[in-house]
């Protein structure tokens, strides 16, 4: 069932709303920003079945330098809330992949991750120093990167957030990573060399393939949808290439 903008009507979680506003503000800074039409059955999804309540809202845009800007907000059974965001660059431009995920169970943030992941060989040399200068010293519960996490930069940030101060600091880190992304995108020029473009395409394909190894994504969705729907959603909405 389709719904109106759920983030305007149902979502009340202050942390997710703060992050969402920040991401949207940075997205609005991009040139030639336009929305992308996706199958409406995969855009806004809502169920009021008792014990299996859920809503999923997706936003899709593209802009100069970016082939897809995706934001997903989801709530499952009134206690599991997820904010997922990936900005996929246009392979013609030498821009990293921005990714951010927040998983909140009741009031506990079990996972908070943000990164600018390399989308070409040695690309990280252009921005790793900038990421390393972002202060992350206040976090007490850093988490181990999963085995498939070789796609991330050396400065990927992954933690559980225990205190309110850590939640505020995570918003700051996301803001600074996004600001670095915007600066990089403003400097990027379109490439014409087909081999270089193909290398960037291959990097994005590998990014998506590795992300799909995260079994937690499908485990949550399979509680509400059949396997065919889940596979299509993951490959079409979350990690297409």
UniProtKB/Swiss-Prot annotation:
Catalytic activities: (2R,3Z)-phycocyanobilin + 4 oxidized [2Fe-2S]-[ferredoxin] = biliverdin IXalpha + 4 reduced [2Fe-2S]-[ferredoxin] + 4 H(+)
Q: Name one GO biological process term.
A: phytochromobilin biosynthetic process
Q: Which UniProt keywords apply?
A: Oxidoreductase
Record-listed E.C. numbers: 1.3.7.5
Q: Name one GO molecular function term.
A: phycocyanobilin:ferredoxin oxidoreductase activity
Instruction: Tell me if Oxidoreductase is a UniProt keyword of this record.
Output: yes
Protein family according to the UniProt entry: Belongs to the HY2 family.
So what does this one do?
Answer: Catalyzes the four-electron reduction of biliverdin IX-alpha (2-electron reduction at both the A and D rings); the reaction proceeds via an isolatable 2-electron intermediate, 181,182-dihydrobiliverdin.
- NCBIfam families named in the record: PRK02816.1
Kindly provide the name given to this protein in its UniProt entry: Phycocyanobilin:ferredoxin oxidoreductase
């Amino acid at each position: 069932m389709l719904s109106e903008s759920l983030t305007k009507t149902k979502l009340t979680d202050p942390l997710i709303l703060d992050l969402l506003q920040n991401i949207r503000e940075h997205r609005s800074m991009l040139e030639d920003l336009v929305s992308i039409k996706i199958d409406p059955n995969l855009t806004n999804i809502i169920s009021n079945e008792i014990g299996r309540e859920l809503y999923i809202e997706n936003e899709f845009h593209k802009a100069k330098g970016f082939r897809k800007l995706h934001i997903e907000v989801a709530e499952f059974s009134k206690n599991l809330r997820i904010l997922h965001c990936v900005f996929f660059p246009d392979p013609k431009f030498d821009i990293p992949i921005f990714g951010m995920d927040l998983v909140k169970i009741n009031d506990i943030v079990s996972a908070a991750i943000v990164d600018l992941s390399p989308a070409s060989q040695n690309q990280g040399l252009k921005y790793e120093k900038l990421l390393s200068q972002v202060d992350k010293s206040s976090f007490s519960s850093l988490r181990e990167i999963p085995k498939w996490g070789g796609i991330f930069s050396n400065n990927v940030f992954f933690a559980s957030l225990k205190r309110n101060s850590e939640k505020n600091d995570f918003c700051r880190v996301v803001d600074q990573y996004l600001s670095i992304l915007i600066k990089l995108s403003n400097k990027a020029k379109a490439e014409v060399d087909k081999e270089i473009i193909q290398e960037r395409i291959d990097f994005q394909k590998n990014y998506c393939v590795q992300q799909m190894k995260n079994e937690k994504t499908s485990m949550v969705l399979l509680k509400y949808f059949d396997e065919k729907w889940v596979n299509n959603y993951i490959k079409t909405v979350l990690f297409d290439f």
